[in-house]
């Protein structure tokens, strides 16, 4: 049985999350509370929300945990060529926090294999919008000829980035944003991006599962460090993947 959380209640230990033999491995608790304070408490303990419209807020701590080391991002030969072209072409831009809510809404409207509807509900948009206004949630956006064509968003605490979702309206547009983000994070000493759950797509980008215990230990160490400031970069971060040898598919 999972724990029901009232607003003042702490999270239970992550070891109490449902195990792999259950119908919902990793499910830890449920609540109605989705305040910024609750979200920050969750992230600092390796917990994240994921639920559908009409459900209570469901809190998860999966084991293993899917993570991506920024320096191990996999760049295919074709994507490397695209990045080189983008660096030369002024029609392409990387913008940070241009319109955070618009990025969330674009992610919400993107069809996902095996998913009906979206977990990015109005309440989720409002909650993460509050974190964005606090300077703790950010969007990385790929623009082409004045139009947002892809991007991603996530939460940044200390030297830890928690990726939430991405979208692409042009081929590789979300990968372009991720490549820029990884270049920026690597320069600032971030060694792990939380990807939450295992998927083939994340694995193709270089993400790997690690034991939850290892993930939690890393979060406790890095989330307590000073936040990155300023959170600003542009497409020049893409040179990380074009000017020197890096992992290729």
Curated annotation (Swiss-Prot):
Q: Which species is this UniProt entry from?
A: Cupriavidus metallidurans (strain ATCC 43123 / DSM 2839 / NBRC 102507 / CH34)
Q: What is this protein called?
A: Leucyl/phenylalanyl-tRNA--protein transferase
* NCBIfam families referenced in this protein's UniProt entry, alphabetically: aat
- Give compartment(s): Cytoplasm
The GO biological-process annotations, alphabetized, read as:
protein catabolic process
For whether the record's keyword set contains DNA-binding, the answer is: no
Principal subcellular localisation of the protein: cytoplasm
**Gene Ontology terms, MF aspect:** leucyl-tRNA--protein transferase activity
Looking up Pfam families in the UniProt record yields:
Leu_Phe_trans (PF03588)
Q: Which UniProt keywords apply?
A: Acyltransferase, Cytoplasm, Transferase
